[in-house]
Structures are given as C-alpha cells and as structure tokens.
UniProtKB/Swiss-Prot annotation:
Its main location: nucleus. Residues 1-76, 116-135, 266-327, 347-386, 405-425 are annotated as: Disordered. GO terms for cellular component: cytoplasm; nucleus. The keyword Endoplasmic reticulum does not apply. One of its GO terms (molecular function) is RNA polymerase II cis-regulatory region sequence-specific DNA binding. This is Probable DNA-binding protein creA. Pfam families: zf-C2H2. A zinc finger (C2H2-type) spans 75-97, 103-127. It comes from Aspergillus clavatus (strain ATCC 1007 / CBS 513.65 / DSM 816 / NCTC 3887 / NRRL 1 / QM 1276 / 107). It is found in: Nucleus. The gene is creA. Residues 31-51, 288-302, 406-416 have a biased composition (Low complexity).
Length: 425
C-alpha cells in the first residue's frame, strides 16, 4: 500500500535530505498517462506541506536555530535557575525580580517608567500619535501642570506685596480670640490666603491651628466648670441644717478643679476683647490645696449679674489671704515680704448663708480700724503690719446649731471680712 501524501510531506519537511535519496527510486520510464496522476500527487503534497508549515513554525524552532541550543549560557540568574546567553538578557530578567524601572518616559507631564526599553518604545508611540485620545488627555494634563507651576512661582514671588505684616505680635501663651478687633485684618481674607501659602509662611498657619486647638480646650474647660458650678450650687442649696464647714472640708480636699483652669485661661488671654473678661479680673481665687485654707475651692464675689455664682452664695475669705482693693485704684501697693508678719493667723469662724436679702454688707456702715492705705502711708516700716483679726469666741453647739449663731451679720466687721470689704469694689 503506497504511503499517503500527508505522511510523505511531513517526512520531507522534517528531513530535507530524503527527496534526494528517494528520487532514484521513482520509476523514470513511465508512460505519459501515468505522469498526470503523479503531477497531481506532487501538487497535493506541496499544498499539504504549506498548510502544515505555520503550526510547525509555532511549535518548534526552525532548523537553522537548532545549533543555538548548544551554545553556552554563562549568565545565570542569582535568584532563580534561568541562564542566558547575553549579559543584557540577564540584566533585563533580574529587573523582573527587583521591580526596577530605569526607563522613564521623557514626554512632559508623563510619569510612567518601564523596566525594558522596548516597552518604553511602545509607550512613546502613544504620545507621538496625534489621533490618540490618551495623547490628548496627556497634553491637557501637561498644560495644566505647567500653568499650576507658573502660578505657584507668581505666588511665591509676590508674597511680600500680598501678605501685610501682622499688626500685633502673635504670642504662644495667649490663645487667639474669635471676637474680631478693629486693628486686625478680616478673618476671611487670611483664611483664603492661608491655603496658598508655602513653607516660608508656615509659622502663621501653625499658630492658627494651635489657636483653634486652644479654643477647643477652653470650650471644654468652660463647659466642665459650668457643670461643676451647678453641682456646687445644688450642694449648697440642699438641706439648710447641714453646717457649711463640712462642705468646706470636702471642697478643700479635692484637686484643683477645671473651673480654676478656665478662669486662668481667661486671665491670660489678650485684653483686646475686654467685653468677654468683664468679671475675670475681679475674681479672687484661693488655692484649694493650701494647708491653711478654710474657704471653698472657688469663692467669688457676687457684685453684678455677670458673676458665675448666684447672688446668695456666702462670701468667705481665708485668714491668710491679702486684703485686696479694686484694680482701678492707683494707691494699691502691697508690702514687701520682709515687712509681713511670720506669725500664724488664726482661722476664721465658719459662716452660714443668710436666707433672705441679697446684700451681705452695707457700704454706709462706719469703718472700724485702720485701712490698708493708712497702714501703707506710715513712714515707719515696722508699723506697716496688718492688724490681727479678732475672732469671736463661739461654742461648738452654736456652730452646729443653724439658728443659734449667724456670722453673716458680722461679715462686714473688721474681724471676719477684713473691714475693707466696701473698698474692694
């Protein structure tokens, strides 16, 4: 049985020397009638070989490249088992392990990088093609980036003319108030310009952020002190039979409250907004953890409606605190430390709230004893001493009895309230 045409074509393609060897085997002395079928057979063999050529080229290497398999592969990858004939092939392969992309696109506005040069060449065709949509988008992005860079340069060059110097020095200790004063630029113009400032104008922006954080802390402290005052007020308005010194001991044993922090923050802020600090400069705070303290942690004067405590809160002044006059007087001068007495001042008697009448003193009452101005006007330095207050002798039963002893009536005398209470306002 003769072999088929497809098998003959496949063997001839794999072994090119077979046709020369099989040529003598074909009969030469054939009749012309048999030559026509042989020519048709040869044509079909050529067609089948051509049809089989593409899959052979895809699946196997050409015959002229077979000797390349025997070439040495001296360049081996240190990270895997692959070896290469050329050094550049090994270098290109190692970049697949390291992720290095040394080939960057040189087109303005494009930030892409590639590990192989042929990938960069293929990518550059996108920018060179004028009909590509990606090219148009890249051009728009590049133009926008160039315009932004030019605008930044203009802003940096014109910062001296656009930003006026601040009219008041900015301190780190005083928080910035939200109330606008007439000598400060409007806040909206500063915030609009602050978004475009660069690193050389950074301290102003940081001061703004620090001020906002300080204001947040002040708001929290104010809210906490308000709650604390409400609780303190509810405690004092509770049962009338409770003696006041028990609450005084309870208040003096705790740590400094948040209300003292809020008042201290109000005292340290700038005086350009005095409408907020109408009463803060009049408030007298005594230290709650003082060993000689016999007063509550935060006694305040109830002289007007802006006082943080109600009008019927009892007024108590520790015995060791100085007798202060109002800040508006010009003759206020405190004695030096060497002129003060080192003797221990006896504690004041406890006082109870008066149920009726908001006023605890009468400005028209006669003044007993020398005042601070009289003491300070003495020429002799040894005579400049505060008089020792005369504490009334009260029994323990009178102190515990709410109706037996009321010390509010004597709070304006020299022994309890210092005698100069009317001069404080």
């Amino acid at each position: 049985m003769p072999p088929s045409a497809s098998s003959v074509g496949f063997s001839d393609l794999l072994n090119p020397q077979n046709p020369t060897e099989s040529a003598p085997s074909t009969p030469v002395n054939k009749s012309p009638a048999s030559s026509a079928p042989s020519s048709a057979q040869s044509n079909s063999t050529m067609a089948s070989s051509v049809s089989l050529l593409p899959p052979l080229m895809k699946g196997t290497r050409p015959a002229n490249e077979e000797p390349r398999q025997d070439l040495p592969r001296p360049y081996k990858c240190p990270l895997c088992d692959r070896a290469f004939h050329r050094l550049e092939h090994q270098t290109r392969h190692i970049r697949t392990h390291t992720g290095e992309k040394p080939h960057a696109c040189q087109f303005p506005g494009c930030t892409k990088r590639f590990s192989r040069s042929d990938e960069l060449t293929r990518h550059s065709r996108i920018h060179n093609n004028p009909n590509s949509r990606r090219n148009n988008k890249a051009q728009h992005l590049a133009a926008a980036a160039a315009a932004a860079a030019n605008q930044d340069n203009v802003l940096v060059n014109n910062t001296g003319s656009m930003m006026p110097p601040p009219s008041k020095p900015i301190t780190r200790s005083a928080p910035v108030s939200q109330v606008g004063s007439p000598d400060i630029s409007p806040p909206h113009s500063f915030t609009n310009y602050a978004g475009h400032m660069r690193s050389n104008l950074g301290p102003y922006a940081r001061n703004n952020e620090r001020a906002s954080s300080g204001m947040d802390i002040n708001l929290l402290a104010t809210a906490a002190s308000q709650v604390e005052r409400d609780e303190h007020f509810g405690f004092h308005n509770g049962p009338r039979g409770l003696p006041l010194f028990s609450s005084r001991l309870h208040n003096s044993s705790r740590l400094p409250s948040l209300s003292a922090y809020a008042i201290s923050q109000n005292m340290t802020r700038s005086h350009s907004h005095d409408e907020e600090d109408v009463y803060s400069h009049r408030v007298k705070r005594s230290r709650p953890n003082s060993p000689n303290s016999t007063a509550p942690s935060s006694p305040t004067f109830s002289h007007d409606s802006l006082s943080p405590t109600p009008d019927h809160t009892p007024l108590a002044t520790p015995a060791h605190s100085p007798r202060l006059r109002p800040l508006g007087t010009s003759e206020l001068q405190l004695p030096s430390i060497r002129h003060l007495s080192l003797h221990h001042t006896p504690a004041l008697a406890p006082m109870e709230p008066q149920p009726e009448g908001p006023n605890y003193y009468s400005p028209t009452q006669p003044h007993h004893g020398p005042s601070i101005s009289d003491i300070m006007s003495k020429p002799d330095g040894t005579q400049r001493k505060l008089p020792v207050p005369q504490v009334p002798k009260v029994a323990v039963q009178d102190m515990l009895n709410p109706t037996g002893f009321v010390s509010v009536s004597s709070s304006t005398s020299n022994s309890v309230a210092g005698g100069d209470l009317a001069e404080r306002f």
